[in-house]
Amino acid sequence: MTEIVNIFKKPHYFNYFTFVIFFLIIFTLISRFIFLDYRAIHHDESLHGYYSWLLSNGFGYTHNPLMHGPLNFHLNALVFLIFGDSDYTLRIAPAVAGTFVVLTPFLFIKIIGRYPSILISVFLLISPIITYFSRFARNDIFIALVSIILIYQVFRYLYMVEGKKNLFLISICLGFIFCIKEISFIIIFILGSFSLIFSSFNPFIKHKLNLNYQFTNIFALLFLLSFPLSMPISSYVFNFFGINLVAPSGALNKIGMPIGNVAI
């Protein structure tokens, strides 16, 4: 018996979810990359662009807290090396990060489901704030992207998807987040406080939650990797006793080298 084949039948790999994702990516790329150089360069962008240009041309990079972390400058310098320097290329790196920000809800698809993921992505796509900072050569969109990935890895560890591998990826996210912007300390404080409340260190809920072990490990990891960066605060205590452990602001010595009466 001859089987009649319907040529209009959808292939097995096609579904409406794939269709939506495809067009979501297309519209996101258009909204992030079209006419990137039409808007005048903002004051902050001019600083980031200039020092990135110096780095890309071999003049080196000197960190200045006024302009936040170094990651933005290194990414811009890499783009300048590959595509040349222009108003358009200055905004390529944040545009790429902004594209991924729109797609990040799909990382949580097993937790929140397909339709909520699509809805959140659409809101991120049309959000004026997210769109603006996705086309703005500053650190804001990078911190948003890495923060979402960090939270995603925390969730994966809580559900023990890949165990120690997730802790390693959390550490990588922390490394990046501290290279972007100072708000990273607030983000780590929020995650750390939440983890501490539900960890084994809290005597009120100890042994009452199945996730005590995971929350304890997350808190320990966040604390141990973040605490060394807070050591300059110790200068207020040690200076009271006449012990100078922290170099003054603007010191030009190499990191780790003594300066004046500084002990370390």
Go through each PLM region and give its residues.
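Membrane-integral, polyisoprenol-dependent glycosyltransferases
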Residues: 1-264
